[in-house]
């Protein structure tokens, strides 16, 4: 039987019921709000917060990129700890591996440890007006002078050697000096090249990366190709970089945690034309290297708030090479440096010549001297540029280099035809019966181009290039039809831009503090900031790859090859005989005669000008005995006779070195 209730009790019960429903509804709404609450969102697709990520894998070290820096980092990690768990992700497919390292000129600069300060003087002069922090500068220059034995030991098990890039043994004094007029350019060094000892070649295309790839695989490296690192993963609270997101070949994405650190060895941004537009001001700047180097690492660093540096400089350090871009390749060929026939010229947008096009600018990484400064060759400012030639020049040789540039150095290289006929058939080269017709086909004013060719031919007849001083020996009349044109574009083999790092390889924020967990190596964030000395980028990649791993693992691998290591003495390949050199004493010159037998220095004597020396006979005998006994120029000077000792060792470089510029 129902209980009778009063109106007051009814209202009280109803109110309590409504309150309960309200509380229940609020709970449901709050739960729904929690479900719909936005996840931690970073500012860019290039960085995700770890709070939103479920890890699929975990490794000690994550190496992003498998060029020179990536291979060096893996090798160093293995040599520190054979059980290290290091995973390597690379964006390219295996057939096109190697990054900018395989497309480069394949040179590595080494410095005699006994001449480190002279090398530093030269490096400072190249950097000006930019200043590299002293700690960074001293670290890098010292590495260039001390790590040759480590590199030799790395390559030894896979039968690769470090030789002179021009052929023969690596000897002190055999090198290319790009800026011989700068202070310190007389440093004692050597330009190295890595090559298969049994390959029979003095120069191996891609040899430097080939050697390090083999050395890394020998030590167990298993690079995962077609695995593109698409983002960094960072703790939203602590800001530590904890891992990466990786896009696999099938399109799926995995997240990999790094227990000790993430290494960005992804190269520069040569393959991203828009980044060149924004950072370097060029409307069309092409990539001469790997098509997979598209600035991904730089974009990740920017998304993190890393401190950028060397995005641009007084010059484009590696230089605007003259590229030839064709539809069949994403990156460019490099125009032939040494033309056998002189019936050619380059013209700018208006159909006129704009500089001495035949000079060997590649020896200064496409710089020339103007008003007391080295500046970039002006190809980027004169677009569109075309090379104009006659039939004699066209048939004389390939129009492109066969040893630098991605299309000719990758693992499946293109072989340009000897007479350019195949490329003409492909439509890569423009042909016309007359200069006027050629001008119309390439978008130049016919009358202007005709006048420029006539002017060029008249200067050939006169025996002088009155406009730009081109060596008349490199010029011939452009008169034998048909005529040809090929477009040239500014092309970059490398760039230095990226986030600043310290000598430990740690990427820095704008306060100069390390971003925990993130490291970089190689071209991305390079220390190179203005003029570029041949062999620097590849060597820096090796040094910085090692430094980052040393920091992560808290160790350092010290390796020595079985043969002792180092570079040979300058006289190591000299023929038997006497070599006479006039050297400069404190005030006046004197003659020094060096005797070589069986590739060894066996005698040093003084010829003319003995009276101009300050050292006495006893000091001379002591010093020369040290040189002969040690077969090493690094012996200490005799007290009281420093200037004469330096003159004698300097004479060795004059007598036996092979410096080019």
Predicted regions and their residues:
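Conserved redox-cofactor binding core of oxidoreductases
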Residues: 142-252, 273-274, 321-322, 460-480
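Glycine-rich loop(s) and the adjacent beta-strand/alpha-helix scaffold that form part
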Residues: 249-252, 256-325, 538, 544-547
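An anion/pyrophosphate-binding glycine-rich loop and adjacent beta-alpha core
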Residues: 298-300, 307-441
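Beta1/beta-strand and adjacent pyrophosphate-binding region of the FAD-binding site
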Residues: 53-69
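A glycine-rich dinucleotide-binding beta-alpha-beta segment and adjacent secondary-structure elements
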Residues: 231, 448-528, 605-609
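Active-site- and interface-proximal helix/loop "cap" or "latch" segments in soluble metabolic
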Residues: 568-661
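N-terminal secretory signal peptides and thylakoid transit peptides that target proteins
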Residues: 1-18
């Amino acid at each position: 039987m129902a209980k009778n209730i009063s109106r007051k009790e009814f209202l009280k019960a109803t109110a309590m019921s409504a309150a309960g429903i309200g509380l229940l509804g609020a709970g449901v709404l709050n739960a729904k709000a929690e479900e719909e609450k936005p996840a931690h969102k970073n500012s860019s697709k290039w960085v995700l917060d770890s709070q939103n990520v479920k890890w699929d894998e975990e490794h000690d070290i994550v190496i992003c990129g498998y060029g020179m820096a990536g291979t060096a980092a893996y090798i160093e990690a293995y040599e520190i700890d054979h059980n290290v768990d290091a995973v390597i992700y690379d964006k390219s497919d295996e057939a096109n591996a190697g990054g900018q390292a395989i497309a480069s000129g394949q040179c590595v600069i080494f410095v005699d440890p006994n001449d480190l300060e002279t090398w530093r003087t030269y490096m400072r002069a190249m950097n000006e007006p930019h200043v590299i922090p002293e700690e960074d500068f001293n670290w890098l220059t010292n590495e260039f002078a001390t790590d040759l034995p480590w590199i030799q030991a790395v390559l030894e098990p896979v039968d690769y050697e470090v030789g002179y890039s021009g052929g023969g043994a690596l000897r002190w004094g055999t090198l290319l000096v790009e800026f011989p007029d700068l202070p310190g350019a007389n440093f004692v060094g050597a330009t190295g090249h890595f090559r298969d000892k049994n390959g029979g070649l003095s120069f191996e295309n891609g040899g430097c990366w080939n050697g390090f790839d083999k050395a890394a695989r020998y030590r167990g490296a298993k690079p995962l190709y077609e695995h593109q690192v698409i983002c960094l993963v960072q703790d939203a609270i602590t800001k530590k970089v904890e891992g990466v997101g990786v896009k696999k070949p099938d399109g799926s994405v995995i997240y990999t945690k790094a227990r000790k650190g993430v290494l960005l060895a992804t190269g520069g941004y040569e393959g991203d034309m828009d980044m060149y537009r924004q950072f370097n001001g060029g409307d069309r700047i092409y990539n001469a290297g790997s098509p997979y180097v598209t600035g991904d690492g730089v974009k990740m660093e920017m998304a993190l708030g890393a401190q950028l540096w060397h995005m641009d400089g007084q010059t484009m350090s590696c230089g605007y090479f003259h590229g030839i871009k064709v539809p069949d390749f994403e990156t460019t060929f490099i125009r032939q440096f040494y033309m056998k026939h002189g019936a050619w010229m380059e013209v700018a947008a208006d159909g006129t010549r704009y500089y001495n096009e035949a000079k060997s600018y590649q020896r200064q990484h496409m710089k020339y001297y103007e008003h007391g400064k080295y500046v970039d060759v002006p190809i980027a400012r004169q677009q569109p540029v075309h090379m104009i030639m006659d039939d004699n020049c066209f048939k004389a040789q390939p129009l492109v280099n066969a040893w630098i540039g991605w299309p000719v150095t990758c693992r499946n290289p293109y072989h340009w035809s000897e007479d350019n006929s195949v490329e003409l058939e492909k439509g890569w080269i423009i042909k016309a019966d007359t200069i006027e017709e050629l001008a119309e086909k390439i978008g130049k004013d016919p009358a202007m181009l005709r006048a420029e060719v006539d002017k060029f031919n008249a200067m050939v007849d006169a025996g002088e290039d009155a406009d730009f001083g081109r060596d008349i020996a490199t010029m011939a009349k452009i008169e034998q039809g048909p005529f040809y044109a090929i477009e040239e574009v500014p092309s970059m083999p490398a760039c230095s831009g990226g986030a600043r790092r310290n000598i430990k390889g740690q990427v820095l924020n704008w306060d100069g503090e390390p971003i925990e967990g993130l490291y970089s190596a190689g071209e991305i964030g390079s220390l190179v900031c203005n003029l570029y000395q041949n062999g620097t980028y590849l060597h820096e990649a090796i040094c910085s790859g090692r430094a980052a791993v040393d920091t992560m693992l808290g160790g350092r691998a010290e390796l020595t090859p079985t043969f002792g290591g180092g570079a040979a003495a300058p006289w190591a390949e000299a023929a038997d005989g006497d070599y006479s050199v006039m050297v400069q004493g404190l005030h006046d010159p004197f003659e020094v005669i060096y005797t070589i037998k069986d590739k060894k220095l066996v005698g040093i004597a003084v010829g003319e000008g003995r009276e101009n020396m300050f050292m006495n006979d006893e000091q001379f005998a002591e010093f020369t005995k040290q040189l002969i006994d040690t077969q090493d120029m690094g012996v200490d000077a005799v007290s009281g006779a420093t200037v004469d000792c330096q003159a004698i060792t300097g004479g060795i470089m004059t007598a036996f070195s092979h410096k080019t510029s």
